[in-house]
Amino acid sequence: MSSLPLQKSLYPLLRPLGAAYRVLMRARRRRYENGAACGTDVPCVSVGNIGWGGSGKTPVVQWLLQWAAVHGLHAVVLTRGYKASPPGLPYVVTPQSSAAHAGDEPLMLARSCPQATVVVDPVRSRSARWAQERLAPDFFVLDDGFQHVQVARDTDLVLLKKDDLHAEWGRVLPAGSWREGPEALSRAAAFCIKCGSGEFSGLVPDFENRLGSFGVPVFGFSLRPGALIPVCGAHEGAQLPAGAPYVLFSGVGDPAQVAVTVSSFLGYDPVRHHVFADHHGYTQADMDRMAGYGLPLVCTPKDAVKLTAPCGVPVWTLSLETNFHSVWNAQPPAGQAGEGFAQWWQCRWQRLAGLR
């Protein structure tokens, strides 16, 4: 999500407040860098962003968890669990948990990556210590961890939106969407930007101008549709009839991208796209209103985990896979020019594991 229209119109007035917030965030970080952060006994990887909005953090976390499962490693995700109301803290999310207890994204991760453990706790230094004692992790993943200072980390994967390289560059809250100033990007081990493979080359001048001085790779990724999976109102293995009209609904950070992805996968647009706020909790009234069209419904996996009310009509979700497709590096190390994300991460992991 980019700056709001009011922020843009009031930017000259809000800019001094943004500068003050930027200084405050720097001072806060220095305090923890001087020894107040909680260390961990195993490698810790943060996946976060510089600003607010849907930059694709959860798909990148999911990629790391799937990589860990393939390599026989136990990954533990430390997440605050936005809008979660767990019965106790720390709270271990299971595939059987409710979205109300776990939060939508933690529950989605727990269901899609059962070999990993997802722990919800807004105090992540507490959940890190608790998990080290009880869960035998091979490494931690800090979800939305770039500005989180309580837990020390070995690697920061920083996600950027295309707007971050243009109009949003350096606009710190409340003057823009950024949580810190551009100097914070020097902490990044790599940048990841969600874009189509055809868009990536057009962004290279921005990488050179904005990110080249940091000397780390920039990886492009997209969400590749997998299959339509019935959620309710249709038996397992059922298929949406080819060409059948449908209604799309989503409560995510980038609804426009959802519409593009679903329409491209099915080959035609929905009759209607109901857009809800990010992390929206679906009510019976919501489902009744959408079922009133008498058409099948399609949603994202993040929406699907929150469907507890009777649907009234068949509902499908479109499974998505994280696809790293491009890389740019101003100064690639010897032998690493054009190295893809999987290869880069494998080398990074070997170094991290060797230091412990």
Swiss-Prot record:
Tell me which Pfam families the record gives.
Answer: LpxK
* Pathway in which the depicted protein is active: Glycolipid biosynthesis; lipid IV(A) biosynthesis; lipid IV(A) from (3R)-3-hydroxytetradecanoyl-[acyl-carrier-protein] and UDP-N-acetyl-alpha-D-glucosamine: step 6/6
Instruction: Provide GO CC annotations from the record.
Output: plasma membrane
Enzyme class, broadest EC rank: transferase
Reactions listed under catalytic activity: a lipid A disaccharide + ATP = a lipid IVA + ADP + H(+)
Residues annotated as binding ATP: G51, W52, G53, G54, S55, G56, K57, T58
As recorded in UniProt, its EC number(s) are 2.7.1.130
Is-annotated flag, keyword Transferase?
A: yes
Among the GO molecular function terms of this UniProt record, one is:
ATP binding
Task: From the UniProt record, give one GO term of the biological process aspect.
Answer: lipid A biosynthetic process
**Source species, domain of life:** Bacteria
**UniProt keyword list:** ATP-binding, Kinase, Lipid A biosynthesis, Lipid biosynthesis, Lipid metabolism, Nucleotide-binding, Transferase
- What does this chain do? Transfers the gamma-phosphate of ATP to the 4'-position of a tetraacyldisaccharide 1-phosphate intermediate (termed DS-1-P) to form tetraacyldisaccharide 1,4'-bis-phosphate (lipid IVA).
Family per record: Belongs to the LpxK family.
**Cited PANTHER family:** TETRAACYLDISACCHARIDE 4'-KINASE, TETRAACYLDISACCHARIDE 4'-KINASE, MITOCHONDRIAL-RELATED
Return the protein name. Tetraacyldisaccharide 4'-kinase
Source organism per entry reads Oleidesulfovibrio alaskensis (strain ATCC BAA-1058 / DSM 17464 / G20) (Desulfovibrio alaskensis)
Lineage of the species this protein comes from: Bacteria, Pseudomonadati, Thermodesulfobacteriota, Desulfovibrionia, Desulfovibrionales
Encoded by which gene? lpxK
